[in-house]
């Protein structure tokens, strides 16, 4: 089936996140209330990647900082749907949406152990701005940014 990107909601993003093995359980357990809090209201956006009628990936973000930047909070692709351009399609769709909405940059945080995500972000022009070191280097948090418009 052809892939298409559509608008979703916090509940759809949460359901997909729960099916993606890389997301933390335990201390950082996924919480539907947190999804609703971060993604509800006019500043939240959930994009769903659909193969036919089945959601196979998502990208969710919101206006976290109120400074003209967009915060890409969470996203992922189901393991069986990887390797087919789903993450790239979601990344581009979110960038296009953010530009059309007037945002100047996109921030995203990831962890060192999420190598595929890091490669994708760097490949498509995201710069590493900051590293929060952890005892286990694989758990280092990385803040990346991509400028969508302008020189500043």
Region spans (language model):
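Conserved N-terminal entry element of GNAT/NAT acetyltransferase domains
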Residues: 1-11, 146-152
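Acetyl-CoA-dependent GNAT
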Residues: 7, 15-73, 78, 91, ...
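Short alpha-helical
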Residues: 12, 67, 112-116
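A short, internal acetyl-CoA/4′-phosphopantetheine-binding micro-motif in the GNAT/acyltransferase core
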Residues: 74-83, 110-112
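Conserved acetyl-CoA-binding loop-helix of GNAT-fold acetyltransferases
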Residues: 77, 83-96, 119, 123
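Conserved GNAT acetyl-CoA-binding A-motif
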Residues: 91, 98-110
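Conserved catalytic-core motifs of GNAT/GCN5-like acyltransferases
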Residues: 107-110, 122-143
């Amino acid at each position: 089936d052809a892939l298409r990107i559509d608008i979703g909601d916090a509940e759809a993003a949460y359901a997909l996140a729960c099916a993606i093995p890389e997301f933390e359980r335990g201390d950082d357990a996924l919480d539907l209330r947190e999804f609703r809090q971060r993604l509800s209201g006019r500043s939240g956006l959930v994009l769903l990647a659909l193969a036919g009628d089945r959601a196979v990936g998502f990208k969710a973000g919101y206006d976290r900082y109120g400074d003209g930047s967009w915060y890409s909070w969470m996203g992922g692709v189901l393991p069986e749907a990887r390797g087919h351009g789903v993450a790239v399609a979601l990344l581009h769709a979110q960038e296009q949406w953010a530009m059309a909405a007037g945002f100047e940059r996109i921030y995203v945080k990831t962890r060192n152990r999420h190598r595929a995500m890091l490669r994708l972000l760097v490949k498509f022009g995201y710069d590493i701005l900051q590293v929060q070191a952890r005892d286990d280097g694989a758990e280092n948090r990385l803040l990346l940014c991509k400028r969508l418009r302008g020189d500043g």
